[in-house]
A protein has these predicted regions:
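Short hydrophobic alpha-helices and adjacent helix-cap/hinge residues
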Residues: 1-139
């Protein structure tokens, strides 16, 4: 795929975050948000969303809320799916199965959520197939 991950250390300050975003923006084709309590707060969220939006750099958000606020998309899961899986495991335990034999499980149905308005702003074309397959599309 030719992907290269670039890590930019961020000094959390009024000047530190914008400087890191600017440095990334000059070399990145997209930005991936990862959970980091030291970088993300209500004070930094606006800058984190605005820089990629203004510079037409796709930002892969942390959650549905980030997509609703302007990131291009996020990968998530339908919360009913892990709930159903948990209920099925509980039934197996109640029926006497030993928990030692249960393999590690992951959500069966990952989903993605798109922000079509952001895609249009960035002049990105999203196929009808992707739009139809999305769990939610913010327009």
């Amino acid at each position: 795929m030719g992907l290269k991950i670039v890590v930019i250390p961020v000094v959390i300050s009024v000047k530190g975050l914008p400087a890191a975003l600017k440095q990334l923006g000059s070399i990145a084709d997209s930005l991936l948000g990862i959970v980091d309590k030291s970088s993300y707060s209500s004070k930094t969220a606006k800058a984190i969303l605005l820089y990629p939006f203004r510079n037409r750099i796709p930002f892969i958000g942390l959650s549905r809320a980030w997509v609703k606020s302007g990131s291009l998309y996020t990968l998530d899961w339908d919360y009913a799916d892990p709930g159903q899986q948990s209920a099925n495991l509980a039934l197996r335990i109640l029926n006497g199965e030993k928990t030692k034999i249960f393999p590690l499980q992951f959500a069966d149905k990952p989903i993605y959520i798109l922000n079509q308005k952001t895609a249009k702003h960035m002049k990105l074309e999203i196929s009808q197939e992707l739009l139809e397959g999305s769990f939610k599309v913010y327009k």
